[in-house]
């Protein structure tokens, strides 16, 4: 086949006339058979060799090409009677409702016709949409009497999918076609059918195109039997019924039999085009599986457009499970050697790299870093086997391409599905490692939403210098630390850095830093008076930039009425002066996901590479600190003394008694309804309020008995590393009210939630209040709130996925031009300034152009105030 050499400037959509279908056809298909006894295709049947061939042993009878090279050719079936095309049934119904049943003129006066025709021609000249004008014409052309021949009109209905009913009479496709044939070209244009490319009667089929064999290839099963494609099955049905209809018509069969066969032919043609058309039972395989016909090949997630055109399987990609590795840098990905040897990078041989390329070829495909193929300037591909290696090395010269293995430092694209935002696909540098999983730094998990319970990720290897340059410029991990920022460092950082004691293991801590490796080099702080130790704050200061100045409140801040600043015992007031941590603890607020103050400042003042260095160094320091100081948690962290348990129990009993009082007041008619609420709603709201307060108070009691300095579970909750205080108090004190649809549990068996409660009981326990803690015991009602959460999550995921797809399709053509305007692909201005203020959220201070408070703080710190 020759390629198209001319540039395509536009595409016109139209309908094929019966003559066009016959001209395009290379064979008229008559009988419903496929192969003869020897397994060869028969002429004038569905696998006619003129329609194209599959399998390299046969040649196409139309173009002479072998199987695999022949694109295929259309055939045609002459239908015994016309049938309506199911895709145009709605259009036919609209047209018939707008034209006269006798003369087929449009139901408009001559003046109106001239006026609308002029408007359409002007809109076509300006290349504007005709849809609003056509809609207006259809709305106007609904009249009871024809303005041209004075014929009375009857209401026309569409009985889905293709039956047209006028009054009480069902129109046959032949009658429909006759009416459409009488429409003039001028009227056709007003009805939205351009006579240059289509005629209304072509929507009623008299000739059916038969797709090429290459579109519906038959396969040979293991048993040796041939299995035909679903389209071929459907075409066999159409041919069989068409043949029977023709024979019955020629034999003069009764009208009833002819009409039944005609209906059946219409059914088969309808399901051939769309096997999910409403009002028609789907055509099925012998096994009961619905056939996948033309519309199903194109429609939906598995169809041609979304499955094969928008998204497709590609070469030079790899997929495997991901594992955590804190020794891999934030912007790196650990690639298994097995993958590195299989997925290659094409490198042009030059006089500067020829020796290095020869080394790769020498190693061959089995030794890393080697090469798998060499491509000669004439395009021939040679595998770098041991047998051919010497010849390849001898002939290698500039201009050849060597497909070498992946090696350290190569840039690749890393992706985790579902790809919900731009940080689901980022550029990483390769580090080739042993074993069979991708290795990922834990800092990069939040943007990918990855965890290590079996998640798999995809890697794509760039094949051109342009794509590599683009990825390095736009997609590096460190360039996406902001908007949204990520990173949720382990709570061990808090423990190490908040401890006021000094570390006699200072050198051991420093040795894990990427630079400098020894505390005596670079910015090592001076040792204390005895010359042996450093404070942990001094150690942490080593990973901060020299002139960093900032003040903020840490995650553990209690939000006191009057800020105690540096005097607060829990060290929640963070002050950094000229790169030295003076006071404060380092927790999630320092470099957590969406909240990292220090990380945020470093990115904005020193750039993304400095932020990457800080993340790497802080991670290594944290891990070394945890290894040195130890950090673990167990159920003992959720233990409280008996005294606390008694206080909690008394408080909960008191709350349940108050609930009983409310119920008694309701039953005695003493309860006053709240404004705008019924008595029942008032009772439920007051009960929920009492039980909510009881749960909160029991949590506060439990919290007051926790050791804030030594209890590791509490440290994790306070620093934002994992969980919240609510989780701890539910484990320790009281789970609380289980909520379903925003209220207490009401549904159950015969006017009660569980069989062991009294009928109609309204008490706290019988409606889902869990008195005990997770640690003590549980009741059956506990699962109901959790179950609602799971169902909600599943439904929300589907809804948000569909919503995002619609938004992406609607907004994908919008861009911000060089003037800061939002424009679509036609140049139409959507916004004169992006976001109305022209601020890039990624470079703003949480949406603001400038943070004045931060600037004032910096000036004060730099001036020593």
UniProtKB/Swiss-Prot annotation:
Keyword Ligase: no
Source species, domain of life: Archaea
A molecular-function term among this protein's GO annotations: DNA-directed RNA polymerase activity
Nucleotidyltransferase recorded as keyword: yes
Free-text comment on the cofactor: Binds at least 2 Zn(2+) per subunit.
One cellular component (GO) term of this entry: DNA-directed RNA polymerase complex
Role noted for this protein: DNA-dependent RNA polymerase (RNAP) catalyzes the transcription of DNA into RNA using the four ribonucleoside triphosphates as substrates. Forms the clamp head domain.
Pfam families: RNA_pol_Rpb1_1, RNA_pol_Rpb1_2, RNA_pol_Rpb1_3, RNA_pol_Rpb1_4, RNA_pol_Rpb1_5
Positions contributing to Zn(2+) 1 binding: 60, 63, 70, 73
Alphabetically ordered keywords of this record: Cytoplasm, DNA-binding, DNA-directed RNA polymerase, Magnesium, Metal-binding, Nucleotidyltransferase, Transcription, Transferase, Zinc
Biological source species: Methanothermobacter thermautotrophicus (strain Winter)
Cofactor: Mg(2+); Zn(2+)
Family: Belongs to the RNA polymerase beta' chain family.
Region (Disordered): 500-531
Alphabetical list of SMART domains matching this protein: RPOLA_N
The protein's name in its UniProt record: DNA-directed RNA polymerase subunit Rpo1N
Subunit structure, as described in the record: Part of the RNA polymerase complex.
Cross-referenced CDD domains: RNAP_archeal_A
GO biological process: DNA-templated transcription
Subcellular compartments: Cytoplasm
Positions bound to Zn(2+) 2: 100, 103, 146, 149
Reaction equation(s) it catalyzes: RNA(n) + a ribonucleoside 5'-triphosphate = RNA(n+1) + diphosphate
Binding-site residues for Mg(2+), renumbered to this chain: 451, 453, 455
Ranges of compositional bias, category Basic and acidic residues: 515-531
Entry's EC annotation: 2.7.7.6
Signal peptide: none
């Amino acid at each position: 086949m020759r390629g198209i050499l001319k540039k395509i400037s536009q595409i016109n959509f139209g309908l094929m006339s019966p003559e066009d279908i016959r001209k395009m056809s290379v064979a008229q298909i008559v009988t419903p058979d496929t192969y003869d006894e020897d397994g060869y295709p028969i002429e004038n049947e569905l696998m006619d060799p003129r329609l194209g061939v599959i399998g390299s042993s046969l040649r196409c009878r139309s173009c002479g090409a072998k199987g695999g090279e022949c694109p295929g050719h259309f055939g045609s079936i002459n239908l015994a009677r016309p049938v309506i095309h199911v895709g145009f049934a709605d259009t036919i119904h609209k047209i018939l409702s707008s034209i006269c049943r006798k003369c087929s003129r449009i139901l408009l006066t001559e003046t109106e016709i001239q006026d609308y025709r002029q408007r359409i021609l002007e809109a076509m000249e300006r290349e504007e949409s005709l849809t609003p004008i056509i809609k207006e014409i259809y709305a106007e052309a609904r009249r009871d009497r024809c303005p041209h021949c004075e014929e009375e009109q009857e209401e026309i209905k569409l009985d889905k999918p293709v039956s047209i009913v006028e009054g009480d009479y069902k129109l046959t496709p032949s009658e429909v076609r006759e009416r459409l044939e009488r429409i003039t070209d001028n009227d056709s244009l007003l009805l939205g059918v351009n006579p240059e490319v289509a005629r209304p009667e072509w929507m009623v089929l008299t000739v059916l195109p038969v797709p090429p064999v290459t579109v519906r290839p038959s396969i040979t099963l293991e048993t040796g039997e041939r299995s035909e494609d679903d389209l071929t099955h459907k075409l066999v049905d159409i041919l069989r019924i068409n043949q029977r209809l023709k024979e019955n018509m020629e034999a003069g069969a009764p009208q009833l039999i002819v009409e039944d066969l005609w209906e059946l032919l219409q059914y088969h043609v309808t399901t051939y085009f769309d096997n999910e058309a409403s009002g028609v039972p789907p055509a099925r395989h012998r096994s009961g599986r619905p056939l996948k016909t033309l519309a199903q090949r194109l429609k939906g997630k598995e169809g041609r457009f979304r499955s094969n055109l928008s998204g497709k399987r590609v070469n030079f990609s790899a997929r495997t499970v991901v594992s955590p590795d804190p020794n891999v840098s934030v912007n790196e990905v650990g690639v298994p050697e097995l993958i590195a040897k299989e997925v290659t990078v094409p490198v042009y041989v030059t006089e500067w790299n020829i020796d290095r390329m020869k080394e790769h070829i020498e190693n061959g495909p089995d030794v890393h870093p080697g090469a798998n193929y060499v491509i000669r300037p004439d395009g021939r591909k040679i595998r770098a086997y041991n047998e051919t290696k010497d010849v390849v090395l001898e002939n290698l010269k500039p201009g050849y391409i060597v497909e070498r293995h992946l090696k350290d430092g190569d840039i690749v694209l890393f992706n985790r599905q579902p790809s919900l935002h731009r940080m689901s696909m980022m550029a990483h540098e390769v580090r080739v490692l042993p074993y069979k999983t991708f290795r990922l730094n834990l800092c990069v998990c939040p943007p990918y939403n990855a965890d290590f319970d079996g998640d798999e990720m995809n890697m794509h290897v760039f094949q051109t210098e342009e794509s590599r340059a683009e990825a390095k410029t736009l997609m590096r991990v460190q360039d996406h630390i902001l908007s949204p920022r990520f990173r949720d460092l382990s709570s061990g950082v808090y423990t190490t850095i908040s401890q006021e004691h000094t570390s006699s293991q200072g050198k051991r801590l420093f040795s894990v830093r990427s630079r400098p490796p020894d505390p005596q080099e670079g910015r090592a702080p001076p040792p204390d008076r005895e010359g042996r130790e450093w404070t942990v704050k001094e150690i942490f200061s080593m990973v901060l930039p020299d002139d960093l100045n900032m003040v903020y409140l840490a995650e553990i801040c209690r939000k006191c009425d009057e800020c105690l600043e540096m005097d607060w015992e829990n060290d929640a007031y963070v002050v950094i002066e000229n790169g030295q941590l003076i006071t404060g603890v380092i927790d999630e607020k320092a470099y957590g996901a969406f909240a990292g103050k220090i990380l945020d400042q470093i990115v904005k003042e020193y750039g993304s590479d400095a932020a990457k260095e800080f993340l790497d160094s802080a991670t290594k320091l944290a891990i070394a600190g945890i290894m040195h100081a130890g950090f673990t948690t167990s159920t003992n962290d959720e233990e409280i003394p008996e005294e606390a348990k008694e206080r909690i129990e008394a408080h909960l009993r008191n709350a349940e008694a108050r609930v009983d009082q409310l119920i008694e007041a309701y039953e005695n008619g003493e309860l006053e309804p709240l404004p705008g609420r019924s008595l029942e709603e008032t009772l439920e709201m007051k009960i929920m309020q009492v039980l909510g307060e009881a749960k909160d108070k029991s949590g506060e009691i439990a919290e007051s008995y926790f050791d804030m300095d030594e209890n590791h579970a509490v440290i994790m909750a306070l620093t934002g590393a994992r969980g919240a205080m609510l989780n701890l108090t539910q484990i320790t004190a009281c789970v609380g009210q289980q909520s379903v649809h925003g209220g207490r549990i009401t549904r159950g068996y015969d006017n009660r939630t569980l069989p062991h409660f009294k009928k109609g009981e309204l008490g706290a326990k019988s409606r889902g209040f869990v008195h005990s803690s997770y640690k003590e015991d549980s009741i059956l009602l506990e699962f109901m709130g959790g179950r609602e959460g799971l169902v909600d999550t599943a439904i929300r995921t589907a809804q948000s996925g569909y919503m995002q797809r619609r938004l992406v399709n609607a907004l994908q053509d919008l861009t911000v031009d060089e003037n800061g305007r939002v424009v679509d692909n036609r140049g139409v201005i959507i916004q004169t300034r992006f976001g109305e203020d022209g601020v890039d959220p990624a470079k703003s201070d949480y949406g603001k152009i400038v943070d004045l408070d931060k600037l004032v703080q910096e000036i004060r710190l730099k001036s020593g105030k």
